[in-house]
Curated annotation (Swiss-Prot):
Function: Has an anti-hypocalcemic action on calcium and phosphate homeostasis.
Protein name: Stanniocalcin-2
Subcellular location: Secreted
GO cellular component term, pick one: endoplasmic reticulum
Length: 302
């Protein structure tokens, strides 16, 4: 079913591609200018390109990098897949058994996904580009790129070239994934890219590395502020202890006041005040007991 649909689509695309130049000479449809044509090609894959890629995908073999070569020359400027494939194959002998298995399975996964998804995707360049990068990430993660990189770090580092990061987005996507594969892999790749950058750009790379270190500095700030937080906690604890010791002199004064009140004839509720001062604040229950005593006292007087 899918093969039939691809065949019909290719035939229709080829027919439309042959009709399109003749339609541009019609009096009611003036030919497009160079700017319009270039902007249209950048925003959408041309019908001729679509038909060529479809034809290439059908004829490409399952082994090798033929499927990825189909995307090298297109108006959406999606390049780099073929280069990554060739780099992996050329360095496959340097990998251990796990690394070789990863290369075989990941390349096969990417080729299979490209062949099946391309016919179902829009011709808009952003949609095609996102599809390519998404399936690439899926295949790398599915077949455990990080495990292969951790066991073959030296070979992985040798495969990464600074100039490829400037020209091909799939390389950037691959390196970004590798940077998440642990500190050892991350440090090795970062050092290699910085050295290559200095060889190509000279002192400009030193400026970029300085900016990067300045950006990465804020996360180290919290440990420096930690002693201040500890000092603040100690200060609060000191004030808390002082607060706990404050009631002692007040209780003594309350005791002295109670003795003085005992010696003099005071109002009946002075006893209640002395009790509140000696035992601390009692809340609603203390006030209700005092009211009960007052009511009993008034009943006796009656």
């Amino acid at each position: 079913m899918c093969a039939e649909r691809l065949g019909h689509f290719m035939t229709l695309a080829l027919v439309l591609a042959t009709i399109d130049p003749a339609r541009g000479t019609d009096a009611t449809n003036p030919p497009e200018g160079p700017q319009d044509r270039s902007s249209q090609q950048k925003g959408r894959l041309s019908l001729q390109n679509t038909a060529e890629i479809q034809h290439c995908l059908v004829n490409a073999g399952d082994v090798g990098c033929g499927v990825f070569e189909c995307f090298e020359n297109n108006s959406c400027e999606i390049r780099g897949l073929h280069g990554i494939c060739m780099t992996f194959l050329h360095n496959a002998g340097k990998f251990d058994a796990q690394g070789k298995s990863f290369i075989k399975d990941a390349l096969k996964c990417k080729a299979h996904a490209l062949r099946h998804r391309f016919g179902c995707i829009s011709r808009k360049c952003p949609a095609i580009r996102e599809m390519v990068f998404q399936l690439q990430r899926e295949c790398y993660l599915k077949h455990d790129l990080c495990a292969a990189a951790q066991e073959n770090t030296r070979v992985i580092v040798e495969m990464i070239h600074f100039k490829d990061l400037l020209l091909h987005e799939p390389y950037v996507d691959l390196v970004n994934l590798l940077l998440t594969c642990g500190e050892e892999v991350k440090e090795a790749i970062t050092h290699s890219v910085q050295v290559q950058c200095e060889q190509n750009w000279g002192s400009l790379c030193s400026i970029l590395s300085f900016c990067t270190s300045a950006i990465q500095r804020p996360p180290t700030a919290p440990p420096e502020r930690q002693p201040q937080v500890d000092r603040a906690k100690l200060s609060r604890a000191h004030h808390g202890e002082a607060g706990h010791h404050l009631p002692e002199p007040s209780s003594r004064e309350t005791g002295r006041g109670a003795k003085g009140e005992r010696g003099s004839k005071s109002h009946p509720n002075a006893h209640a005040r002395g009790r509140v001062g000696g035992l601390g604040a009692q809340g609603p229950s203390g006030s209700s007991e005092w009211e009960d005593e007052q009511s009993e006292y008034s009943d006796i007087r009656r």
